[in-house]
UniProtKB/Swiss-Prot annotation:
Gene name for this UniProt entry: ABCG32
Name of the featured protein: ABC transporter G family member 32
Residue ranges constituting the ABC transporter domain according to the UniProt record: 162-435, 853-1105
Family: Belongs to the ABC transporter superfamily. ABCG family. PDR (TC 3.A.1.205) subfamily.
Location(s) in or outside the cell: Membrane
ABC transmembrane type-2 domain location: 513-725, 1178-1392
Main location: membrane
PROSITE patterns per the UniProt record, alphabetical: ABC_TRANSPORTER_2
Role this protein plays: May be a general defense protein.
Keywords on record: ATP-binding, Membrane, Nucleotide-binding, Repeat, Transmembrane, Transmembrane helix, Transport
Pfam families in the record: ABC2_membrane, ABC_tran, PDR_assoc
Organism, as annotated: Oryza sativa subsp. japonica
Length: 1451
């Protein structure tokens, strides 16, 4: 865009701005290329005329038009097109012509782009990034002080307040994340960023991209082409690509990238294209037509479908899944590897010239990683970009694609410079990379205290640990380091900076274009989430039916007796419509992580996001409110005047808009599901209690009257009541009185009697709608996402980090012990294969049976997907495994490999018995006996890829629980603890024993620590057979080596282990004994030994005619996947599966399977006297123990709920102050009953809502643990239910004591105990109902949608809005099964059911009024108490039943 860099004064003038460059000229004219590109005599006359006509257009029009071939094959008609109106189909066809195969044609395509610019002397903008003496410091909690327990959360809150008021200092300790780092990132060079976990890689990338958080202490400077960060907009000049994949799951891959491209704009491409077009015209140069169309289409911003989107889809290999939804935890979408590529592509579609990419290869196989990095490298080198890429386990061939290396360790730069000199530097330091070791793997390990010694090659000097500071100091004196220092000492010549290099405008396109983009996306998401709106409409329809049949006009007269009932119907309408907006809260919170990411990347300002979410809901509101009002108004018997009908309709529309805006605002400030689900009901309760229905305006205390005037519901109540009761139906007068029936009813409830209050109320609701939307916009504009980027760290880890940064050598007894242990644990191939040394898991203490697993002709199929059936596929089932056979044996480590879609995880799930659906055929035997899943679960372990663990327990507690549940009961407690310690030492988790597990990507353990915990959780079960699904995915080389060393040691104890693996390095791949290789479609193509240095594998495939030989030093795993690809099969005309089945190897495997399928003489089948290792009672105790820890360390649930309760207690206590003693008037009793009704309903709903996210998280863990045979469903449900009892008891006591004393109910032991009893069981059954709703539904969203429908029914039939004696006889039965009705019965009857004082002006006692008006009898309290217990037990039982019987996990 012109505004983004500089406005070109006149594109027809030879502006000096566009011509100065490194030597004073940016765009030098080329004299050599022009003649070769002039019109040729033999060109087609018609085409020449068409081009000539296009050339005659003004430059502004010419850059929007091009000549496009209408068919991808190249033989179609050429037509003139407006590139701004090209559709997705034309864009795909164009890209298909330009880049037929990304591997072969991408570089040629880029060279064509560059050649076109070179011919007229235009350079692409470049950026040189410099960072000098950069220091980043964070404040962290150390040790157990950082665990988020209930106590710690309270202390943290108090200290944070004290710190903000400068009363008390912070108790956090400083931790240096980056220490004195300096360097230069050159354009046209690919830079690889390496370093062990915690080295500061992500922080460095964020610092270079200008995205560091404000709460960090930062010193030093980062410059782009000599310009400081405050001189341009770094978020738009550079693109930071996060390691976390945050996307809207309902959008397809193409839609996600297209939206990103639409928001980011085209940068300087339009200005450069205009200059290019002007120069080409001046020199009579005709460009390649496809290149011309591409460059013009890519320079037009704001398009719904962009040619750049199609280009990025192509080079990232996402074109095959472009129309598949991205998906999330609740919606199946693309694979994890594809989702990672979507994250990368989301930023590549933009115009940023500098790329900072954080772990972009997680979940990708090595060949895909190579292709993506190669494509990015081609773009960087040819078009002059700048890139720093952090990779976890780069294969040697991927490593060789980089020009420069930055090695970071403990926040210091150990090396930065050309790749060719890195090994030279470390050899000078005394360390040498072994021959078959990847250089990247060597670099990740050489600075680690645990791995360093194995690489020491100086025999003349004894090894001593070299700390990071010593490396960093040595690098500064190394010739590469000196060269960087010399270059940094001379400032960058800012005059060399291309005017288009740095972005100076905050956003990529105009505000209106961004608003339109967000409107289009919101419409798309509303369409994709249409089931939510359908369900809300259905819920309103059901509620309307209940209202019509409960408040039936034929049963109600228009007099003062039934005026209260009509008032209840109006209030219920307000309550229903108000609560209808509650669904916005959950939907808003779920979209916020993506919003915050895109806001911080400057995709759009917050208001362009918030306005569509409000405006587009208005038509929906009109429809939803219409469903309710149009069906109920005349049936209930409201005033028949048409104008009053439409006025009620408009008022409820305004109320619904206000409600939706309120809950969006609460979601915006809460930013967390549990917190928002807590404060949502709190606001609803406050507005309702002060709305004038529960407590009439004259009875509101003077200190709360301001609350009445700011409550939106008070205005709604006045408006809807005056609209109804000033109508003709209520216009009858009492004899001898001036007031009509309607006015009398209004006065009795303290409601204004003037007609103007309708319009005052309506205006107030519109005002509140605008206010809440404004506050929502402000919240999203300035608030940051919740979460701590730098959580607590163990004390030892912080000491070691500081020692490495200062060069200090820790010297203590503990250090000497750990040094000895570390030396014995060095990552060494020789050590991996040393069986004698590796039998660390004590077979003597915990013996196990050595078991083999064989399988023959395994087929797995699923019902044919509807999408394929729609495409004409006639088969009923889709076959995913096609007769797979093989065997896994004790002491043999088998790698299960294949490209994505080969069926690796599917086969493993089938063998492990983890499939929940589909059809399985074939034979599986365990040491010769048919596999029985009940016994197999006892002797097997399964390390899932997703690392699912309870987030609120520590590492040690996770292992204790697993061992407790899975080891035989004969193993005593001491032996079990010793075994756990042994496993922790083996997997190197000892230093993390007290670390909280946390949620992936949010807090707690890092990816590699979580992966090691997954392995350890299975190892402590002492299994005979272990399945591991991608145990090294997402890990760096050193962490992968730790995991594989653990696996190797496990195998060497005699266990049977099989691992699926994606992109192994050479040494990790060759740590395996055998390979089970599958191809896409679910067939095996090699099953056999690897051999020394993979010799047998290489010999087998090189023996196939046409297969290329492996190059020296090449990774056999990568080579194997490349030569067996589908493309290779098509090129060679062979089928690797058929070749394997004709081989001698296949025959030998068949014989082995036959042998292993026959029991050995004297052996017996697996048998256990019980299904589970532990007794039912022990399972219950263990599950309760784990839930106790989880609840104590989940303050966002327990502490926030308690805080909510205290606030409500104080609110109600002060609002209804001393009303419990007032029993002289009916209104006094209505007020007291109203306080009970509101408390029960809203605190109960809050309990029910906020427990649901907690249950959802733990249920996912439960599915894994139950599948592992740890326990049955009931003990888990028992633990979840039982742990709520003490927490709700505290909640009840806090609420009960405060409210009972402040409201002034009668202080007798019986009444107080009854009050606490009914409140306790009410909160229990509401909480258990929330659990039950989750247990019976697939996910939290469905539970949150279904629950309000139940709450509505409970509210309506509670006995407050319409007393039970006045409920129509056909609905009266429901009162007996409505729990809230029983709660109100118990509370009211226990407090007022035995008061014999008479009401003022009536010959009726309080007890008689309670009995006659409400139908409550004091002498039936025992029955009410029993019913409360029954409801509580019933909901708990239904939750337990759902947990035991339903499995919503789909595998």
């Amino acid at each position: 865009m012109a505004r983004e860099i500089h406005k070109i004064a006149s594109l027809r003038r030879e502006s000096s701005l566009w011509r100065r460059g490194d030597d004073g000229v940016y765009f030098s004219r080329s004299s050599t290329g022009a003649s070769s590109s002039r019109f040729r005599d033999e060109e087609d006359d018609e085409e020449a005329l068409r081009w000539a006509a296009l050339e005659r257009l003004p430059t502004r029009d010419r850059v929007r038009r091009g000549i496009l071939l209408q068919a991808a094959e190249g033989n179609g008609e050429k037509v003139e097109v407006d590139v701004g109106r090209m559709g997705a189909r034309e864009s795909r066809a164009l890209i298909a012509r330009l880049i037929r195969a990304a591997d072969d044609d991408h570089a040629l395509f880029l060279l064509k782009l560059k050649d076109r610019m070179d011919r007229v002397g235009i350079d692409y903008p470049t950026i040189e990034v410099r960072f000098e003496k950069l220091e980043v410091e964070a404040e962290v909690h150390v040790g157990n002080r950082g665990l988020p327990t209930l106590l710690n959360s309270i202390i943290n809150t108090v200290q944070a307040i004290g710190n903000a008021l400068h009363i008390s200092p912070t108790r956090k300790q400083p931790m240096t994340v980056l220490h004195d780092v300096s360097g230069i990132i050159k354009p046209r060079r690919m830079t690889l960023l390496l370093g062990p976990p915690g080295s500061g890689k992500t922080t460095l990338l964020l610092a270079l991209a200008g995205k560091l958080e404000d709460n960090l202490k930062v010193s030093g400077k980062v410059t782009y082409n000599g310009h400081g960060m405050d001189e341009f907009v770094p978020q738009r000049t550079a693109a930071y690509i996060s390691q976390h994949d945050l996307h809207i799951g309902e959008m397809t891959v193409r839609e996600t990238l297209a939206f990103s491209a639409r928001c980011q704009g085209v940068g300087s491409r339009y200005d450069m294209l205009t200059e290019l077009s002007r120069r080409e015209k001046a020199e009579n140069i005709k460009p390649d037509q496809d290149i011309d169309v591409y460059m013009k289409a890519s320079a037009i911003g704001g398009q719904e479908s962009s040619v750049v989107t199609e280009y990025i889809l192509k080079i990232l290999g996402l074109d095959i899944c472009a129309d598949t939804v991205v998906g999330n935890d609740m919606l199946r979408g693309v694979s994890g590897g594809q989702r990672k590529r979507v994250t990368t592509g989301e930023m590549l579609v933009g115009p940023a010239r500098a790329l900072f990419m954080d772990e972009i290869s997680t979940g990708l196989d090595s060949s895909t990683t190579y292709q993506i990095v190669n494509s990015i490298g081609q773009t960087i080198r040819i078009l002059g970009g700048t890139a720093v890429i952090s990779l976890l386990q780069p294969a040697p061939e991927t490593y060789n694609l980089f020009d420069d290396i930055i090695l970071l360790s403990d926040g210091q730069i150990v090396y930065q410079g050309a790749r060719e000199h890195v090994l030279e530097f470390f050899e000078l330091m005394g360390f040498r990379c072994p021959q078959r070791k990847g250089v990247a793997d060597f670099l990740q390990e050489v600075t680690s205290k645990k791995d360093q010694e194995q690489y020491w090659y100086r025999n003349d000097i004894p090894y001593s640990f070299v700390p990071v500071k010593q490396f960093a100091d040595a690098f500064r004196s190394f010739h590469v380091g000196q060269s960087i220092q010399n270059e940094l000492s001379e400032p960058f010549d800012r005059s060399r900076s291309h005017p288009a290099s740095l972005a100076t405008s905050k956003f990529g396109v105009s505000w209106m274009a961004l608003l339109k983009a967000n409107i289009d996306r919101e419409l798309l998401l509303m369409k994709r989430n249409s089931f939510v709106y359908i369900f809300k409409a259905a819920n309103l329809t059901l509620t309307a039916f209940l209202v019509m049949t409960t408040f039936l006009r034929t049963k109600m007269r228009h007099d003062t007796t039934y005026g209260t009932i009509y008032m209840g119907a109006l209030y219920f309408a307000l309550d229903t419509i108000m609560f209808n907006g509650f669904a916005e809260l959950g939907m808003t919170v779920m979209k916020l992580p993506v919003f915050f990411k895109q806001r911080d990347l400057l995709f759009f300002p917050a208001w362009t996001y918030t306005i569509p979410s409000w405006i587009l809901q208005i038509p929906v509101t009109f429809f939803e409110v219409g469903v309710y009002v149009f069906t109920t108004y005349y049936v209930v018997g409201f005033d028949p005047n048409v104008s009053r009908f439409f006025k009620q309709y408009l008022l409820l529309v305004a109320l619904n808009q206000m409600s939706s805006s309120l809950f969006r605002f609460i979601a915006g400030i809460g930013r967390d599901m549990v917190v928002s689900q807590t404060f949502g009901p709190l606001s609803l309760l406050a507005f309702t209690a002060l709305g004038g229905f529960i407590l009439a305006r004259p009875d509101v205390k003077k200190w709360w009257i301001w609350g009445y005037w700011i409550s939106p519901l008070s205005y709604a109540q006045n408006a809807i009541s005056t609209n109804e009761f000033l109508g003709r139906s209520w216009n009858k007068s009492f004899p001898g009185q001036n007031d009509t029936v309607g006015i009398s009813i209004l006065k009795s409830r303290g409601i204004f009697t003037e007609a103007k209050w309708y319009w005052i109320g309506f205006g107030a609701l519109i005002g509140y709608t605008l206010l809440f939307n404004l506050l929502y916009t402000v919240a999203l504009s300035f608030l940051k996402p919740l979460g701590d980027s730098y959580p607590s760290v163990p004390e030892d880890a912080l000491k070691e980090k500081r020692a490495n940064q200062t060069g200090e050598i820790l010297d203590s007894c503990e250090e000497k012990k750990s040094r000895k242990k570390e030396q014995s644990q060095s990552v060494n191939q020789k050590h991996w294969n040393n069986t004698a040394e590796s039998s660390q898991i004590r077979q003597g203490i915990l013996p196990f049976a050595q078991l083999s697993l064989s399988f023959n002709d395994i087929k797995y199929s699923v019902d044919m997907p509807e999408a394929m059936t729609a495409q004409g596929v006639t088969e009923e089932r889709l076959l995913l495994l096609k007769g797979v056979s093989g065997s896994f044996r004790p002491g043999v480590l088998t790698a299960l490999m294949g490209v994505s879609g080969a069926g690796k995880t599917t086969l493993m799930d089938v063998l492990a018995g983890r499939k929940t659906g589909g059809y399985i055929e074939g034979d599986i035997t365990i040491s010769g006996y048919p596999k029985k899943q009940e016994t197999f679960a006892r002797i097997s372990g399964y390390c899932e890829q997703n690392d699912i663990h309870s987030p609120h327990v520590t590492v040690y507690e996770s292992l204790v629980f697993s061992a407790w549940m899975r080891l035989p009961s004969e193993v005593d407690s001491e032996t079990r603890k010793m075994f756990i310690e042994e496993v922790m030492e083996l997997v190197e988790l000892t230093s993390l024993r007290g670390a909280l597990v946390g949620l992936p990507g949010v807090n707690g353990l890092s990816t590699e620590q979580r992966k090691r915990l997954t392995v350890a959780v299975e190892l402590v079960a002492n299994p005979s057979i272990i399945f591991m699904d991608e145990p090294t995915s997402g890990l760096d080389a050193r962490a992968a080596a730790i995991v594989m060393r653990t696996v190797r040691k496990t195998v060497d104890t005699g266990r049977t282990v099989v691992c699926t693996i994606h992109q192994p390095s050479i040494d990790i791949f060759e740590a395996f004994d055998e390979l089970f290789l599958m191809k896409r479609g679910g067939e095996e193509i090699y099953v056999g030994p690897l051999g020394q240095n993979s010799s047998k594998l290489i010999e087998y495939f090189e023996g196939i005619e046409g297969i290329s030989k492996i190059k020296d030093g090449y990774n056999p795993a990568t080579w194997m996947l490349e030569v067996t690809s589908t493309t290779q099969e098509e090129m060679l005309g062979i089928d690797f599966s058929e070749i394997y089945k004709r081989s001698e190897l296949y025959q030998r495997n068949k014989e082995l399977i036959q042998d292993l399928s026959t029991p050995t003489p004297g052996s017996t089948d697996l048998h256990f006297p019980t299904q589970y290792s532990r007794s039912f009672f022990t399972q219950c105790i263990a599950c309760l123990w784990k839930h106790k820890l989880s609840y104590w360390r989940n303050p966002s649930y327990t502490a926030v709920r308690l805080l909510f309760t205290i606030i409500i207690a104080l609110l109600f206590g002060t609002m209804f102050w001393d009303l419990g003693r007032k029993t002289k008037k009916e209104q006094d009793l209505f007020n007291a009953v109203g306080s009970m009704y509101a408390a029960v309903l809203y605190i109960g709903i809050q309990n029910s809502g906020c427990v649901q996210p907690v249950v959802v998280v733990e249920r996912t863990v439960f599915y894994r643990e139950r599948a592992a045979g740890m326990y049955s469903g009931f003990p888990y449900a028992f633990g979840q239910v039982a742990i709520e009892l003490p927490y709700i008891l505290v909640q009840t006591l806090v609420y009960g004591v405060l409210v009972y004393s402040m409201i002034g109910f009668e202080w007798t032991v019986a009444k107080f105990i009854w009050y606490l009893f009914f409140m306790y069981f009410t909160l229990l059954y509401f909480t258990f109902f929330g659990m039950m709703a989750v247990g019976l539904t697939p996910n939290e969203s469905i539970a949150a949608i279904i629950s309000p429908a139940i709450y509505n029914a409970w509210n309506l039939f509670s006995g407050y809005l319409i007393p039970r004696p006045k409920i129509p006889v056909w609905w009266r039965w429901y009162c007996w099964i409505c729990p809230v009705a029983w709660t109100l019965y118990g509370l009211v009857a226990s407090q007022f059911g035995n008061i014999q004082t008479k009401l003022d002006g009536k010959d009726q006692t309080v007890a008689q009024f309670i009995t006659e008006y409400y139908g409550f009898h004091h002498d039936l309290l025992w029955l009410v108490a029993v019913v409360h217990v029954v409801f509580t037990v019933m909901f708990a039982f239904l939750f337990s039943f759902a947990i035991m019987k339903f499995n919503f996990q789909r595998r």
